[in-house]
From Swiss-Prot:
Entry's induction text: Expressed from a tri-cistronic operon that encodes AssT, DsbI and DsbL.
Modification after translation (UniProt): The disulfide bond is crucial for enzyme activity.
Name recorded for this polypeptide: Arylsulfate sulfotransferase AssT
EC number, as in UniProt: 2.8.2.22
Reaction catalyzed: an aryl sulfate + a phenol = an aryl sulfate + a phenol; 4-methylumbelliferone sulfate + phenol = phenyl sulfate + 4-methylumbelliferone
The keyword Repressor is annotated on this UniProt entry: no
């Protein structure tokens, strides 16, 4: 009876199969999206990480001379137009569409050549609203609002990537376990060490000169604030463009490479023995990547093991293997505290304490290890926040927020130091650059950096000490602890965009350009921020990331600027307002679609 039933079942299956074949019906499943024009289907957010992008599938077409235009919204909308090269066409197997508006029926034109003919398609690409996954009772708005102050003629096409963040409801809930005192029992609490609590949700977007969001990196791409997984925690920072139009970045225990379509090209854990990557990543002409990290299980001179804070530079290749290491605890002087004791206790990098804003920091000899001001390995004595690579002599230039700007060779020897002279001992004291005026005449400055009868000034708690295309050194001079003291009133503080010319043979430094002092406290960013010279329009681009940080209950202003180099006229000024009060921004950078899809 069982055999009879089995034969009937098999016969029925065969009949159904033959019936499907006879009628030409496809196998079970839904049909793919049909072509939207003369090429293939349009796929919004093809990699699941950038919802304001799309892809026109090639559908096996072989095309060339591709140009994409995303039309502006309304009469004043900013049009985004760019070419697409063969490498990108092959990488995506489609035409990349970048710069869509959120929750909008975007009009997009794609032009190309195929079989010697000029072709063109117009598309309507629908997008949904972008979402901030990290809102709580502190939220002022869902997204970070923008306010366009000024855009001069000729700058309407500018696009700015804003690398900012938003607080999570749980705050910093993870710590590295430090080494217990030798007399501690097994049940005694263990101390914290390292910078694992440096943890916040990313908020990464591109804004146009109408203040519209034109790109968004999904917050879940690299981060997960709902799971206690250190591989998905940290502070997404150091977003820098590569020559290929991709971007490197760091976050906690990983470093990445990604592109504007949201494709993650590299995702590497930090090498064993290192932790807490923040602030900076940069690809060198050799194809390696420089990262700022801390050292795990570092044995101090007193025998105590700690995780160090922002004082090691790693060079890694694209497979993640270590090429070189700069250990600043051996190269510099981790006991120097000349600036540390002059800082505002209310803000150190993005660690903000409103209760102590405006008060001068106090250095205690027994300061606990961890992400706190203090001297020696295991404390925040260096705070390196930027790296520049100088190809002419295979050296690196570091902005050490708590020490100064330093150039170090491949041999780990200091070439020069740009900082006030106080606290530097031999042999490092001999590396201090000597200020000169435009005629090469020495400028007299006291040990705190106050200079006589001159506009020259050093930088204090600075960021982004980078080499410009002119060969000069440009720096965002935050200005906290200026002249190694706190002023009588907090409102006397100011920040500057500043440019120096360094003569390495003579060991001198000349200040050749500055901007911002005249704008006073309303331009003051105590922490974070960036400047970078833009040769295409002879401007100094800057982003003050922490303006009005200490205004209780108010959004923090991130101010995007382009300043005419010759006249110092403001060409662009756009404010970005944090979505929660007293929450700092980090950096911003100019992006050029014309260079991103080669």
């Amino acid at each position: 009876m069982f055999d009879k039933y089995r034969k009937t079942l098999v016969a029925g299956t065969v009949a159904i199969t033959l019936g499907l074949s006879a009628s030409g019906v496809m196998a079970a499943g839904f049909k793919p999206a049909p072509p939207a024009g003369q090429l293939g289907a349009v796929i919004v957010d093809p990699y699941g990480n950038a919802p304001l992008t799309a892809l026109v599938d090639l559908d096996s077409h072989v095309i060339s001379d591709v140009k994409v235009t995303v039309h502006g919204k309304g009469e004043k909308g900013v049009e985004i137009s760019y070419p697409v090269g063969q490498e990108s066409l092959k990488t995506y197997d489609g035409v990349p569409i970048f710069g869509l508006y959120q929750k909008f029926a975007n009009k997009v034109t794609v032009e190309w050549k195929e079989n010697g003919k000029v072709m063109k398609d117009d598309y309507v690409v629908h997008t949904s609203a972008i979402v901030n996954n990290y809102m709580d009772n502190r939220s002022i708005s869902d997204l970070q609002q923008t306010k366009v102050i000024k855009v001069a003629p000729g700058f309407e096409d500018r696009l700015y990537l804003v690398n900012t963040h938003t607080f999570t409801a749980q705050g910093x809930d993870l710590h590295w376990h430090g080494e217990k005192d030798k007399n501690a029992g097994i049940l005694d609490a263990g101390p914290a060490t390292g910078a694992l609590p440096f943890d916040i949700a990313p908020f990464t977007f591109i804004v146009d000169t109408e203040g519209e969001y034109r790109w968004w990196l999904d917050q879940d791409t690299f981060y997960d604030g709902r799971d206690r997984d250190i591989n998905k925690r940290g502070y997404l920072m150091g977003i820098r463009e590569t020559p290929r139009g991709t971007f490197t970045a760091v976050q906690g225990q990983h470093w990445y490479e990604f592109d504007m379509m949201g494709q993650v090209l590299e995702d590497h854990k930090l090498p064993r023995g290192f932790a807490d990557a923040t602030h900076e990543s940069i690809e060198t002409p050799n194809g390696t990547v420089l990262l700022r990290v801390g050292k795990s299980n570092y044995r101090r001179d007193d025998g105590v093991h700690v995780t160090t804070i922002r004082d090691h530079i790693l060079e890694v290749d694209k497979s993640g293997r270590v090429v070189d290491v700069w250990d600043l605890t051996k190269i510099l002087d981790p006991k120097r505290d000349a600036l540390l004791g002059a800082l505002d206790a209310g803000a150190v990098c993005v660690n903000v304490d409103l209760a102590h804003a405006g008060q001068q920091a106090k250095l205690e000899p027994d300061t606990p290890f961890g992400d706190a001001l203090g001297v020696g390995p295991g404390r925040n004595w260096a705070h390196v926040n930027s790296i520049a690579y100088d190809a002419k002599d295979d050296s690196i230039i570091l902005s050490s927020r708590h020490q100064g700007v330093v150039k170090i060779g491949r041999d780990k020897q200091v070439k020069w130091i740009l900082a006030p002279s106080k606290g530097w001992e031999k042999p490092l004291a001999s590396k201090l650059l000597k200020p000169v005026d435009a005629n090469g005449k020495p400028i007299t400055c006291n040990e705190n950096g106050l200079c006589e009868n001159s506009d020259f000034d050093f930088t204090y708690t600075q960021h982004t000490a980078w080499i410009s295309s002119k060969g000069t050194l440009t720096i965002f001079d935050n200005g906290d602890g200026r002249h190694l003291e706190q002023p009588a009133l907090p409102t006397m503080k100011y920040s500057r965009f500043v440019e120096y010319k360094i003569d390495e043979k003579k060991g001198t430094v000349q200040q050749v350009w500055e901007y911002g002092k005249e704008r006073g406290y309303d331009f003051y960013s105590p922490i974070t921020s960036i400047i970078e010279y833009q040769a295409d329009r002879n401007t100094m681009f800057g982003f003050g990331g922490s303006i009005h940080l200490f205004d209780v209950g108010q959004p923090t202003v991130g101010k995007l600027n382009e300043i005419d180099y010759k006249t110092k006229e403001v060409k662009v000024e756009i404010d970005v307002l944090s979505d929660k009060p007293n929450q700092t921004h980090y950096r911003a950078l100019l992006v050029r679609p014309q260079q991103m899809f080669k």
